[in-house]
Amino acid sequence: MVSVIVINYNTFELTAACLRSIYTYTREVSFEVILVDNASTERDPGDFLLEFPLLKLVRSDKNLGFAGGNNLGIRQAAGDHLLLLNSDTELREDSISIALKTLQTKKAVGFVGCRMEYPNGRVQYTARRFRSISWELMDLFRFIPALMPAEQRAERMLGKYFRHDRSLECDWLNGAFLLFERALLDQFPKKKLDDRFFMYAEDQLWCEQATERGRHNYFLADTTIVHVNSGSSSIRQQLSNRLTMYRHELAILKRRKGLGIYYWIFMVIFGFKEYARNAIKWFYFQLTGRLIR
């Protein structure tokens, strides 16, 4: 059985649409849905049960964030397989069953993620490589990857350099859809998802921890879901969230590489590149009211 865990925080309509899509499209596998409400104030979470009476509703008396909320849901889960699914996603087919088949047939898989699109149909960059000095330099000086053959560039860089049109192993996956075996948590610190981050970049941390334990993470292009992305955040908050994510990514690199010369060189390159881009995006937002993704 698959236990699908969804976190709700003041996104009642988005969450209801997500739940509706799960119950509509999931046909080939037994499943349960656990909804963790992170102390929402927008509406009584008990209203979800009016439309979804089979739902397991878990109420938290405070906002535990993404990792903390999922750990709370996992404690209530009965499945051998766990799916973390963002509340601002919608299934368009039986993506859970398709992903489960991949998890069960591939060897030594940590997490399985799937292809995602924005509501307008544009693909999201959900399969990525871990950050490194070489990756940051190639991303900064884009004429370098431009000189590579297209397939080589896509596989080496992933992210925005990859069309997400084929399934492959990757370093880390977007946490909006993460399927894994419950047994994987037995190998994790404290036998749970690492919750040192309240929100943002925790998916990268978990994928790194799975890799350290001999697992690989797999991007599945055979099924697609819709992901609003930051559905519970305003546009201004999204820009602020990016800065938080960058700080967390630096903390992850520090964990992996330590505080030696590699970390400091990386921080200079990464900081210059990402903070400059964020400043441009903020300036553009001030002028137009629109966010560059």
Please annotate each region the language model reported:
Residues Q237-R293:
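Non-catalytic, C-terminal membrane-associated alpha-helical segments of glycosyltransferases
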Residues F12, S21, L35-P45, K62, ...:
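A conserved acidic beta->alpha catalytic loop
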Residues R131-C170:
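Short, flexible, basic/aromatic active-site loop/helix in glycosyltransferases
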Residues E93-A127:
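Conserved donor NDP-sugar-binding/catalytic core segment of glycosyltransferases
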Residues R163-T224:
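A short, conserved alpha-helix in the catalytic core of glycosyltransferases
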Residues R20-S30:
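Short, acidic, metal-binding catalytic loop of nucleotide-sugar glycosyltransferases
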Residues P45, R59-A77, I98:
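Glycine-rich, basic loop-to-helix element that forms the pyrophosphate-binding segment
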Residues L82:
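Short aromatic/hydrophobic "clamp" motif used to bind/position activated sugar donors
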